[in-house]
């Protein structure tokens, strides 16, 4: 119990900041979410560079969706480059299921499903509003996708 109290206090102290924030989740202690140890992302830090890294299936896309949805809910404009089409689902409200309900109950965070305001932009002739860019701004991967190049 003392370990739990010390852990929660350490996380709480580390994620305390002035101003508004986004809740990303709760810290885990021995695989158990600690409802009192919320992981908070201060809005004032969102003008810096960031990295979301991990192996396949570890929640990188979901983390980015949560950040983008919460920023939209707070009135902050978001521009996401979605080459794989994984993020467009934030336009519609999600559907709950027992796994989501169980996770939110364990975190002590209510599940609220809302669609976000989305405008689709495009660099190609696909559907969406044309996004202007110069060729020099493209990296090699994006440039090859725009030109529909293959490995040969």
What function would you assign to each model-found segment?
Residues 1-55, 62-74, 78-79, 84-109, ...:
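Basic- and hydrophobic-enriched, low-structure N-terminal and domain-boundary segments
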Residues 54-61, 133, 148:
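Short, charged/polar micro-motifs that form catalytic or ligand-binding hotspots
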Residues 105-152:
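Helical/strand "switch-coupling" subdomains that flank nucleotide/phosphate-binding cores, especially
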């Amino acid at each position: 119990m003392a370990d739990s109290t010390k852990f929660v206090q350490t996380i709480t102290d580390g994620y305390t900041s002035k101003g508004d924030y986004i809740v990303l989740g709760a810290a885990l202690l021995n695989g158990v979410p600690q409802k009192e140890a919320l992981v908070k992302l201060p809005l004032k830090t969102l003008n810096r560079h960031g990295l979301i890294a991990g192996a396949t299936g570890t929640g990188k896309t979901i983390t980015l969706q949560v950040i983008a949805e919460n920023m939209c809910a707070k009135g902050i404009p978001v521009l996401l480059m979605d080459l794989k089409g994984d993020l467009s689902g934030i336009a519609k409200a999600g559907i709950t299921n027992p796994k989501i309900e169980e996770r939110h109950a364990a975190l002590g965070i209510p599940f609220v499903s809302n669609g976000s305001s989305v405008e689709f932009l495009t660099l190609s002739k696909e559907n969406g509003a044309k996004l202007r860019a110069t060729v020099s701004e493209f990296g090699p991967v994006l440039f090859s996708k725009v030109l529909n190049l293959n490995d040969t």
